[in-house]
Amino acid sequence: MLQLHPSEIKDLVLNGGVIAYPTEAVYGLGCDPDNDTAIQKLLAVKQRPWQKGLILVASEFSQLVDYVDESQLSAEQLEFAFSKWPGPFTFVMPIKPHVSRYLCGEFDSIAVRVSAHDGVRALCQALGKPLVSTSANLAGEDPALSGDEILNAFEGKIDALVLGALGEQRQPSTIIDARSGKILRNGQ
């Protein structure tokens, strides 16, 4: 398995590669959100049903505008999300019509986060777009907390391990429905 720095992954991801990378709290699995083949590979590796949907992480909100239908959110709803970003808050927002079902699952919305983690931000900046994000584990198992765990669990199944350090969080992000304001998962 390749071991790369964030600045070295652009071509691999844009050509359909699936990567493992450190996030705020655990290692994540990621790929290009515009490549259905890569998303299907990620879902197969994780053994996750497509119907559940996935998260997009970004370095700034402008990377998410091709996926999120802002016209369905009020200025106040958007401002609330912006007040929490970058940070450990994931917002469920309405999708634009062209967004892949493999990303949003059986929903008319998608979970999005503007990350405060330097490594995640560097990945998204290198790509020039958001990154699909899901915890690096098989469905129902604990997420990986080290590069060694990634190598043991995913050798031969993913294309690269991105080098870097986990963030300081020990809990997953809080998930909030942007339309209703309802907290769907309490996190950090």
Curated annotation (Swiss-Prot):
Keywords: ATP-binding, Cytoplasm, Nucleotide-binding, Nucleotidyltransferase, Transferase, tRNA processing
Location in the cell: Cytoplasm
Domain YrdC-like: 3-188
Enzyme Commission number(s) of this protein: 2.7.7.87
Enzyme class per UniProt: transferase
Reported function: Required for the formation of a threonylcarbamoyl group on adenosine at position 37 (t(6)A37) in tRNAs that read codons beginning with adenine. Catalyzes the conversion of L-threonine, HCO(3)(-)/CO(2) and ATP to give threonylcarbamoyl-AMP (TC-AMP) as the acyladenylate intermediate, with the release of diphosphate.
Name of the molecule in the record: Threonylcarbamoyl-AMP synthase
Organism: Shewanella sp. (strain ANA-3)
